[in-house]
Swiss-Prot record:
One of its GO terms (molecular function) is tRNA(Ile)-lysidine synthase activity. It is an enzyme of class 6 (ligase). SMART domains: TilS_C (SM00977). It is found in: Cytoplasm. Ligates lysine onto the cytidine present at position 34 of the AUA codon-specific tRNA(Ile) that contains the anticodon CAU, in an ATP-dependent manner. Cytidine is converted to lysidine, thus changing the amino acid specificity of the tRNA from methionine to isoleucine. Coiled coil: none annotated. This is tRNA(Ile)-lysidine synthase. It comes from Symbiobacterium thermophilum (strain DSM 24528 / JCM 14929 / IAM 14863 / T). The N-terminal region contains the highly conserved SGGXDS motif, predicted to be a P-loop motif involved in ATP binding.
Length: 482
């Protein structure tokens, strides 16, 4: 089926467009966005569409980024379409919290939402294709995602007040490249897409080709089909979850203060089928945090273990700056706030650190940001609030806790190890502050005491293949959420 007909059929099947819609088209200059623009331009007269091109110049590739912007400007002039280009300052994405990929994505959608509000657009179209879908499913499978994650990229979704549509999601990358050749379209090629620095690129360049070579060309279609099937089943699970929420006495409050709170009966929650109970916890965290992403399996499991307690009062800090409080079987999910100092329970807790991602730890008054970075980018001198680690040398997953008896580190300039207690005394850390210090650990090994000492064994060197940059920031008193 010709690409134009395939896109037309896909758009109709998923209800992506209405006659007379004003549509923002995200254009990078690559083959996907170029084909998307060309196809929508051809479909526009029949549906009376008003197209408005959008380009985000990330400023990450110097002259190549400027050439991309100029290419898109030429395309807009050739098609007589309006264009909005947003140019970011050098280092702007790197300064944001989270990974570079996630930051670029969030900024792109935020800018498109602003543009939509300014021009009255109803939709924004992006060039995601069937290969992107397969890569997403594979990436999330390797991360251990559930059905929601494995449902992949949705054809239509609401994001930040804007409806995002993906008209090319039913087409393969090969079809798109063939379309560009057939219509004399010469796209820009982003060299970073050919580098193995990012997780998705490794899947695109190494893992998926190896699977295709071993199991045939149907691998991409089969992975994308899996996403389609799971998306339908996920819709059913979502409906069953809403019914289970009602059975558990789900109640939302706090809208007037801008700090949403979810309350429910924990004794009823733990009686639900495990699949539904997990989804209820994830939904509660998403409602309170406002994030599209829920907590991982480990955090959800700990939340359910706590929710079933019927004696006394307990609490647990979850990702996205949400705290679960349980009092005699009643659960309350709310924004977490820093305390004046950690209590006895906080001193016994361990907070897993999301990599990449950001973890708020109100009990210790800190926020921990972690991202994967190229080892070669490490500066000669690190700020006091920053730590770089050789990912392959870490003895376990990263987490934050307070000190424990027997903690030791290997300081720079010393042959062996030294007790943390002695290190804190030598550093003149006040006695009343020592128990509340946040420690970055890998497994049960202390790798960093922010502002005090770093363990030399995990510092990246010439042989490092993958590095993690961790930043610890103090949270202003009274702040909440993320």
């Amino acid at each position: 089926m010709p690409l134009l007909d395939r896109v037309r059929e896909y758009v109709v099947r998923h209800g992506m467009l209405e006659p007379g819609d004003r549509v923002i088209v995200a254009v990078s200059g690559g083959p996907d966005s170029l084909a998307l623009t060309h196809v929508l331009y051809r479909l526009a007269p029949a549906w009376r569409l008003s197209l408005h091109l959008f380009h985000l110049d990330h400023g990450l590739r110097g002259e190549a980024s400027r050439a991309d912007a100029a290419f898109v400007a030429d395309l807009a002039r050739e098609l007589s379409l309006p264009l909005t280009t947003v140019t970011l300052r050098p280092g702007e994405l790197e300064a944001m919290r989270g990974s570079l990929e996630d930051n670029a994505r969030r900024r792109r959608y935020a800018e498109m939402a602003r543009l939509a509000a300014a021009i009255g657009a109803q939709r924004a179209a992006t060039g995601h294709n069937r290969n992107d879908q397969a890569e997403t499913v594979l990436m999330r499978l390797l991360r251990g995602s559930g059905s929601t994650g494995l449902a992949g990229i949705p054809p239509v979704r609401r994001e930040g007040g804007l409806t995002i549509i993906r008209p090319l999601l039913g087409a393969s990358r090969q079809e798109i490249l063939a379309y560009c050749r057939a219509h004399g379209l010469t796209p820009r090629m982003d060299a970073t897409n050919l580098q193995g620095d990012f997780e998705r690129n490794r899947i695109r360049l190494e893992i998926l080709p190896a699977l295709t070579e071993r199991f045939g060309d149907a691998v991409v279609d089969n992975l994308a089909q899996t996403a389609d099937l799971l998306r339908e089943e996920d819709r059913l699970l979502a409906e069953l979850t809403r019914e289970a929420c009602a059975r558990c006495g789900w109640r939302e409050t706090g809208e007037a203060t801008g700090e949403p709170v979810v309350e429910l009966d924990g004794t009823l929650l733990v009686q639900e089928p495990l699949a539904l109970a997990r989804r209820i916890v994830r939904m509660a965290v998403q409602r309170v945090s406002g994030s599209a992403y829920g907590p991982g399996l480990s955090a959800v499991t700990r939340a359910l273990e706590l929710a079933g307690r019927t004696e006394g009062s307990h609490w647990l800090d979850l990702p996205q700056g949400v705290r679960l409080s349980v009092a005699y079987g009643r659960c309350r999910f709310a924004r977490s706030h820093p305390q004046l100092g950690p209590g006895a329970e906080a001193l016994e807790q361990v907070w897993p650190v999301a990599v990449p991602g950001e973890t708020a730890i109100p009990a210790l008054g800190v926020t921990v940001a972690a991202e994967l970075v190229p080892p070669s980018a490490m500066p000669a001198r690190l700020p006091d609030d920053e730590m770089w680690l050789d990912r392959d040398r870490l003895p376990g997953p990263l987490a934050v806790r307070t000190r424990r008896p027997g903690d030791r580190l290997w300081p720079a300039g010393m042959q062996g190890s030294k007790k943390l207690q002695d290190i804190l005394v030598d550093a003149k850390v006040p006695r009343d502050q020592r128990d509340g210090l946040p420690l970055l650990v890998a497994g049960d090994t202390v790798v960093w005491v922010p502002g005090v000492i770093r363990d030399r064994r995990f510092r990246p060197d010439a042989g490092t293949r993958s590095a993690v940059r961790v930043t610890v920031r103090r949270r202003p008193e009274g702040s909440g959420g993320d």
